[in-house]
C-alpha cells in the first residue's frame, strides 16, 4: 500500500532541490507505475548525481516498499569507498529501538549515509519515516533537526498498516510471488514440457505447505524463514534451469519472472 503525507509536509524539503518536484509527485501518488516512471526518468538522465539518485530511490522504496529497477547498478558506485557495505548494514541491524538507530545514522558521514541508504533500499524491509527523513537530510547535507521534528510529528499516514515495523515483509513478498504462479499452475498446459515443469513447481509448493502445517501443529517454535529459504532454493533450481528455456509465451514469462524475483529474495537473506 502506498503512503501519503499531509499537505505542507512534503519530503522535498529534505531533498536536493533539483529532484524536489519528482519527490513531491511520488509521495502524493498511490501508483507504483507512476513511481517507476519517475525513477526511470531520473535514472536514465546522465546529469543526475549519485546523491540525487539515492534520494529518489529512498522515496520510491518508502512509497512502494519495493526496490527500484536496476538500483544495484547505482549502489555499485559506492563499492571501493571507505565504508564496507556489509559492516554498515550489520551496524544498523545491531541497534535496538529508534533512538539507537537515530544515533547510529547521525554517527555516519555523508558517504556512510549513502551506503546505509543503499543497503536499506536493496533490502526487503520497509523504511520508517524517521529513518527516511534522517537519511534524506543527511545526504542533502542538512542537519536532521532542521526538518525531523516537523516531519515525524505531522506526517499523516492514510494506510492503517503502514507503521507495522514487526511484520516480516520478506515473507510477505515471497507469498506474493508464489501467488503470482497460481494462474499458471492451475491453468491448462499446452505442451508436455510445460506440464512437467509446472507440476514440479506445484509439488514443491504443496510439499512446503504440508511441512509447514506439521511444524505449526507440533506446538514447538519453528523458523518460518528457514523453511521458506529451503523452498526458494528448490524453486530457483527449477525456474532457472535449462528446461524452462523450452517453454514459450505467457507461461515462460511468468515462470522466468517469478524465478528471478525469488532468486533475489533468497540472495537478500543468504
From Swiss-Prot:
Chief place of localization? virion
Q: Kindly list the GO CC terms recorded for this protein.
A: viral envelope
At the top level, the lineage of the source is Viruses
Alphabetical UniProt keywords: Viral envelope protein, Viral matrix protein, Virion
Subcellular localization is given as:
Virion
Q: What is this protein called?
A: Matrix protein 1
Q: Which organism is it from?
A: Dhori virus (strain Indian/1313/61) (Dho)
Which GO molecular function entries does the Swiss-Prot or TrEMBL record give? structural constituent of virion
